[in-house]
UniProtKB/Swiss-Prot annotation:
GO cellular component terms, A-Z: organelle inner membrane; plasma membrane; plasma membrane light-harvesting complex
Family per record: Belongs to the antenna complex alpha subunit family.
Official protein name in the record: Light-harvesting protein B-800-850 alpha chain B
Topological category with respect to the lipid bilayer: Single-pass type II membrane protein
GO molecular function: bacteriochlorophyll binding; electron transporter, transferring electrons within the cyclic electron transport pathway of photosynthesis activity; metal ion binding
Intervals, Cytoplasmic compartment: 1-11
Gene: pucAB
Taxonomic superkingdom: Bacteria
Principal subcellular localization: membrane
Membrane-spanning segments: 12-35
Species: Rhodopseudomonas palustris (strain ATCC BAA-98 / CGA009)
Length: 66
């Protein structure tokens, strides 16, 4: 472990809950920011279907040669 000596300064009984709690808070804040600043994400989570774009009309067939 690269930073293994941190546990000589901070008790793991305190440090691990602080670390995991801060990760949880950051994840909740990111999800809140995405939900409050986009219109498509809440619809995606609710399962709303997106209306398919209208199909373009087919081009007319060329005139037959005689």
């Amino acid at each position: 472990m690269n930073q293994g000596r941190i546990w000589t300064v901070v008790n793991p009984g305190v440090g691990l809950p602080l670390l995991l709690g801060s990760v949880t808070v950051i994840a909740i804040l990111v999800h809140y920011a995405v939900l409050s600043n986009t219109t498509w994400f809440p619809k995606y989570w609710n399962g709303a279907t997106v209306a398919a774009p209208a199909a373009a009309p087919a081009p007319a067939a060329p005139a037959a040669k005689k």
